[in-house]
UniProtKB/Swiss-Prot annotation:
Keyword Phosphoprotein on entry: no
Name under which the protein is recorded: Biofilm growth-associated repressor
Residues in HTH arsR-type domain copies: 17-111
Single biological process term from Gene Ontology: negative regulation of DNA-templated transcription
Pfam families assigned: HTH_5
Positions of the DNA-binding region: 51-74
Keywords: DNA-binding, Repressor, Transcription, Transcription regulation
GO annotation, cellular component aspect: protein-DNA complex
Keyword DNA-binding found: yes
UniProt-listed Gene3D superfamilies: Winged helix-like DNA-binding domain superfamily/Winged helix DNA-binding domain
UniProt GO molecular function: DNA-binding transcription repressor activity; transcription cis-regulatory region binding
Role this protein plays: Represses an operon that comprises itself, XF_0764, XF_0765, XF_0766 and blh. Binds to a palindromic AT-rich sequence spanning the -10 region of the blh promoter and blocks transcription of the operon.
Length: 114
């Protein structure tokens, strides 16, 4: 069993609050469930990148990259900054960054230790 004892130190959530949080988490997980979007967020955890840098880093073509960045932008996970002719992307959603860091620790850091 992962957790045998109940944690009574956490504040009790009402059913309505729990439902609201569950929907928020489900929407975030749904957005991050696409492999390209997950790779983009994993990359953007490191900082701000131009579209060209993201294309090189992740190794996907411009049409797919633009489509997936659009989904992340619409969901509020990333925002853009224009510098002359270049567009830069950065994370705006701290919860997404925390989730990606946790996933990295669980799935990637252990592989490096092996």
């Amino acid at each position: 069993m992962v957790n045998e004892m109940r944690d009574d130190t956490r504040p009790h959530m009402t059913r309505e609050d729990m439902e609201k949080r569950a929907n928020e988490v489900a929407n975030l997980l749904k957005t991050l469930s696409h492999p390209v979007r997950l790779m983009l967020v994993c990359t953007l955890v490191e900082g701000e990148f131009s579209v060209g840098e993201l294309e090189q880093q992740i190794g996907i073509g411009q049409p797919t990259l633009s489509q997936q960045l659009g989904v992340l932008r619409e969901s509020g996970i990333v925002e853009t900054r224009r510098n002359i002719k270049q567009i830069f992307y950065r994370l705006t959603e701290a919860k997404a960054a925390q989730l990606v860091n946790a996933l990295y620790t669980i799935f990637c850091a252990q592989e490096k230790q092996a």
